[in-house]
């Protein structure tokens, strides 16, 4: 029966994988719904205050670029050539060999430069033209050939064209998407969890599918009780910090994180899914690798380490078991539990796996940085070639003996190793950091330029164009059977109680990596959600075309902000009523959907603006003269933050003006005014 359950778990998992690759959006069991266009009023202020609506910020986001491009192609004829040229350059930069780059660069020169020069319409500088002409004439077609044009294209788009985008419906759509992004609160309900694929000291790793996009991930779940029992809180929090550091920027050689969240019992990391097994497993199945095969893995691992070191992260646990293969055979470095940020202070702790730890790591109290990873790389490459660590002779398991050898023994390399390989390993395995390859000040560049990697095109490596020596079997899970992986004994943690102070440690644990979320959305549901939203908005416009539109009412007045909020209504204050609010310098107005009657509360009647909580939801409490109070709730985190801020600032400014105003202005007034028609509003209503 257990065997049957294992087979069914594997089949279910593999089917989910195949369907997610073919049509991930079709596999989505939850729908992403964009908020109404009126969200723009709040989101524009929210993003502007955080410096998030500059040209560079929007243009360099995946969703921002797509919307800006769409706007230019459909609305701004003069910008079409620049945008198309920009996209061509980006595609050119991805080309992996010189012949293709030469062919494409000549085509681009003819289409976007020469044609405009002949018609005297070329808008770019003489220096940019001469740069490309000079390099093309010498057939020097590096990936950065058109870089001067990238800079000038961006400069030409960031002025009036970007300002027009900011006034367009495409910017409104950008605000809608950003509202969704900034209001993500994940739980287990947002994932379909499949079979277990691994287990570590604190928890398990599962294959899972994200419910709203259909994308497959690995979910690493750490048991909070087990973490507490082993006093591993610092390690767990450190892993989340290290993953957040290395998961920004595009690095295809690290198992990166897209989300982190926690439940009352678990800490969850949502990571890149690797279906090809680990190098330790394949070493046992395949046997040792040849120099050529090892060179392939070394080159990809070097780029992974280079990315980490650029982020000032030292990995500290490089070994075959932590190198995972994807389904095509390319590798990524996984498990950053022991990684450390050395940007401000160098570590000195003795951590890692015996047989791979650098001498300076073993010497307690000695500070080190990325140097430790280059020594570990030498140990790991030796194992791929010989089947054991250079300091683990005769299969000894005595950790002290392994450490002693690491600190004292000069590694004897086999005669069968080529001179180039011997030079590489001797350089990496230097006990003296100052003499070690990668530690002269050039970092990964020193390894890339080593004779062992002669002929390697590192751009080709980065684009994963070299054929892997080993391709994991298709249609298999490439992980141990779920029953072989086993499970934790619940009795171990039976006496462990999680207290409020334990949970407080994880209050800042949730995280979402913006660029990775946007990439996930664009790959899966972006077009479908936009199309559906366009239909909904078109129907609403057709239905409400005779009614006074929200933005029309606010336009031309000194309305600070407007948008939907929920107001606690009815005589017993038990029902939430959705209303549209307008904040002016001297009043707050609101009305129900489709209503012409306008309610008004002046700043003079408000006694305080406070933050409160109702059923674990943050709310805004307005205390009004006469003992009344208004409770408002927002539909997203950014809306709550901005409404609370603007209401507080407006109230404080109104109170300041009231204190300076003549006393006759302080005569009692009705707390709430109702109008059958919208009140008259002058262009400047700051007078009280």
From Swiss-Prot:
Expressed in brain cortex, hippocampus, striatum, hypothalamus, cerebellum and brainstem (at protein level). Residues 54-175 form the RGS domain. It comes from the Eukaryota. SUPFAM superfamilies: PH domain-like, Protein kinase-like (PK-like), Regulator of G-protein signaling, RGS. Gene3D superfamilies: 1.10.287.1270, Phosphorylase Kinase, domain 1, Pleckstrin-homology domain (PH domain)/Phosphotyrosine-binding domain (PTB), Transferase(Phosphotransferase) domain 1. Its main location: other. The keyword Cell membrane does not apply. GO terms for biological process: desensitization of G protein-coupled receptor signaling pathway; G protein-coupled receptor signaling pathway; inositol phosphate metabolic process; intracellular protein transport; negative regulation of G protein-coupled receptor signaling pathway; receptor internalization; rhodopsin metabolic process. The keyword RNA-binding does not apply. Residues 454-521 form the AGC-kinase C-terminal domain. Residues 1-190 are annotated as: N-terminal. ATP binds at residues 197-205, 220. The active site is at 317 (proton acceptor). Residues 191-453 form the Protein kinase domain. Ubiquitinated. GO terms for molecular function: ATP binding; beta-adrenergic receptor kinase activity; D1 dopamine receptor binding; G protein-coupled receptor binding; G protein-coupled receptor kinase activity; protein serine/threonine kinase activity. Belongs to the protein kinase superfamily. AGC Ser/Thr protein kinase family. GPRK subfamily. Specifically phosphorylates the agonist-occupied form of the beta-adrenergic and closely related receptors. This is G protein-coupled receptor kinase 3. It comes from Rattus norvegicus. The lineage of its organism: Eukaryota, Metazoa, Chordata, Craniata, Vertebrata.
């Amino acid at each position: 029966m257990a065997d049957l359950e294992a087979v069914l778990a594997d089949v279910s998992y593999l089917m989910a994988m195949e369907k997610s690759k073919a049509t991930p959006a079709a596999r989505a069991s939850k729908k992403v719904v964009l908020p109404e266009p009126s969200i723009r009023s709040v989101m524009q202020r929210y993003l502007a205050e955080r410096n998030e609506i500059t040209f560079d910020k929007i243009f360099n986001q995946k969703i921002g670029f797509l919307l800006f491009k769409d706007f230019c192609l459909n609305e701004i004829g003069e910008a079409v050539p620049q945008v198309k040229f920009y996209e061509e350059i980006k595609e050119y930069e991805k080309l992996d060999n010189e012949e293709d780059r030469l062919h494409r660069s000549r085509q681009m020169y003819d289409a976007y430069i020469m044609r405009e020069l002949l018609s005297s319409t070329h808008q770019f500088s003489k220096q940019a033209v001469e740069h490309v002409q000079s390099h093309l004439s010498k057939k020097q077609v590096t990936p950065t050939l058109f870089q001067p044009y990238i800079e000038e294209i961006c400069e030409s788009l960031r002025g009036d064209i970007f300002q027009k985008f900011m006034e367009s419906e495409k910017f409104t759509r950008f605000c809608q998407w950003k509202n969704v992004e900034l209001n993500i609160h994940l739980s287990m309900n947002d994932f379909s969890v499949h079979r277990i694929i691994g287990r570590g000291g604190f928890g398990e790793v599962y294959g899972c599918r994200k419910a709203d996009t259909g994308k497959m991930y690995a979910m690493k779940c750490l048991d909070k009780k087990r973490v507490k029992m082993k006093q591993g809180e610092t390690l767990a929090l450190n892993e989340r910090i290290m993953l957040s550091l290395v998961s920004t920027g595009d690095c295809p050689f690290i198992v990166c994180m897209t989300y982190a969240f926690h439940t009352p019992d678990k800490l969850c990391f949502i990571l890149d899914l690797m279906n090809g097994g680990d190098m330790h497993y394949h070493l046992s199945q395949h046997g040792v690798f040849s120099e050529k095969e090892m060179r392939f893995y070394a080159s990809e691992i070097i780029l992974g380490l280079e990315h980490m070191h650029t982020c000032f992260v030292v990995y500290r646990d490089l070994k075959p078991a932590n190198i995972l293969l994807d389904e095509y055979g390319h590798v990524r470095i996984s498990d950053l539990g022991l990684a450390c940020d050395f940007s401000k202070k160098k570590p000195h702790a003795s951590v890692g796996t015996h047989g791979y730890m650098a001498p300076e790591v073993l010497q307690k109290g000695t500070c080190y940085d990325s140097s430790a990873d280059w020594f570990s790389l030498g140990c790991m490459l030796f194992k791929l070639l010989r089947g054991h660590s250079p300091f683990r002779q005769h299969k000894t398991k005595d950790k002290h003996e392994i450490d002693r050898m690491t600190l004292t023994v000069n590694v004897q390399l086999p005669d069968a190793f080529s001179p180039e390989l011997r030079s590489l390993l001797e350089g990496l395995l230097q006990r003296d950091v100052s003499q070690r390859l990668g530690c002269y000040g050039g970092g990964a560049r020193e390894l890339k330029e080593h004779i062992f990697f002669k002929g390697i095109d590192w751009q080709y490596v980065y684009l994963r164009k070299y054929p892997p020596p080993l391709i994991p079997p298709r249609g298999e899970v490439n992980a141990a059977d779920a029953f072989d992986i086993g499970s934790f004994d619940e009795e171990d943690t039976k006496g462990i109680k999680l207290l409020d102070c334990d949970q407080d440690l994880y209050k800042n644990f949730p995280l979402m990596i913006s660029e990775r979320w946007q990439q996930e959305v664009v790959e899966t549901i972006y077009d479908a959600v936009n199309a559906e939203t366009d239909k909904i908005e078109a129907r609403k416009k057709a239905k409400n075309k005779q009614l006074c539109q929200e933005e029309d009412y606010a336009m031309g007045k000194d309305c600070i902000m407007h948008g939907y909020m929920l107001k606690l209504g009815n005589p017993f204050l038990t029902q939430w009523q959705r209303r549209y609010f307008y904040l002016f310098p001297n009043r707050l107005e609101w009305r129900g959907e489709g209503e012409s009657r306008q309610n008004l509360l002046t700043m003079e009647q408000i006694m305080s603006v406070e933050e409160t909580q109702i059923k674990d939801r943050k709310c805004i409490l307005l205390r009004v003269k006469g003992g009344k109070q208004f409770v408002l709730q927002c539909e997203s985190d950014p809306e709550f933050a901005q409404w609370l801020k603007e209401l507080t600032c407006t109230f404080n400014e109104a109170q300041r003006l009231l204190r300076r105003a003549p006393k006759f202005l302080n005569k009692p007034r009705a707390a709430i005014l109702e109008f059958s028609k919208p009140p008259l509003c002058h262009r400047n209503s700051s007078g009280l």
